[in-house]
């Protein structure tokens, strides 16, 4: 996946000396970042804690957030000279555009020598009990639109089903089921209200406003 998570993971891995390759079925990069925050990317919240997450494994959020904190990401944003501001309740937005954040992700990958195959669909992933491709204790083979790839590890960063029109698919769920990982049936958590033209007319001037509701 060539979104924020995939790009961050590949960039960090590459800079730690790993050979990293990013595959994505879409030609675009970080589309969800591009559309978030009204085009300015609400990229983190300085007040977020593990208590803000619901999970069957609460320790995961605590562990993940202790290893890479909002402050760590803010430091990365500052390193790339991206201007930002706090809007409401700890929410941070780019001053100019989400494109600045996407450029940062690409620059971090370039610094790590990350390869990129886009568009490139993944047809199948196979786990090999022992690796014939070097010193790795185990290995994977990936059948892609551009051929077969051998690797020591696979990171699935394909996102969820939230916005199909920007390329979201059920790929991650299918891979999880293939490897017998438990999957909680997904349910919509953030949904729009849709109107036809006549019904929308009285509210059109309210576009772009937000408010807390309960």
PLM regions with names:
Residues 5, 9-14:
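Small-residue (primarily alanine) positions within well-ordered alpha-helices
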Residues 60-64, 91-96, 158-166:
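Flexible, glycine/proline-enriched loop segments at strand-loop-helix junctions
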Residues 15, 26-28, 66, 73-75, ...:
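Residue-level recognition of phosphate/Mg2+-coordinating polar/acidic sites
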Residues 1-5, 25:
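Glycine-rich Rossmann-fold phosphate-binding loop(s) that bind the pyrophosphate
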Residues 14-38:
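Glycine-rich FAD pyrophosphate-binding loop
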Residues 38-88:
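Glycine-rich active-site loop/strand segments that organize a redox cofactor
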Residues 79-110:
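Mobile, glycine/GP-rich and aromatic-enriched active-site lid/loop segments adjacent to catalytic centers
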Residues 25, 99-100, 104-214:
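Predominantly flavin-linked oxidoreductase catalytic cores and closely associated redox partners
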């Amino acid at each position: 996946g060539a979104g924020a998570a995939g790009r961050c993971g590949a960039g960090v891995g590459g800079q730690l000396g790993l050979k990293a390759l990013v595959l994505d079925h879409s030609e675009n990069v970080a589309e969800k970042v591009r559309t978030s925050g009204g085009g300015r990317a609400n990229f983190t919240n300085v007040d977020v804690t593990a208590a803000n997450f619901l999970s069957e494994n609460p320790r995961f959020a605590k562990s993940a957030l202790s290893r890479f904190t909002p402050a760590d990401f803010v430091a990365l944003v500052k390193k790339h000279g991206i201007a930002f501001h706090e809007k409401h309740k700890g929410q941070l937005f780019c001053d100019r555009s989400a494109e600045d954040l996407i450029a940062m992700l690409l620059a971090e990958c370039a610094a790590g020598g990350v390869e990129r195959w886009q568009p490139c669909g993944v047809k199948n992933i196979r786990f090999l009990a022992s690796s014939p491709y070097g010193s790795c204790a185990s290995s994977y083979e990936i059948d892609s639109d551009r051929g077969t790839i051998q690797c020591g590890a696979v990171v699935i960063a394909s996102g969820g089903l939230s916005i199909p029109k920007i390329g979201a698919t059920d790929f991650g769920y299918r891979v999880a089921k293939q490897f017998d990982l438990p999957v909680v049936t997904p349910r919509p958590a953030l949904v729009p209200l849709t109107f036809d033209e006549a019904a929308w007319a009285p509210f059109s001037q309210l576009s772009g406003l937000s408010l807390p509701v309960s």
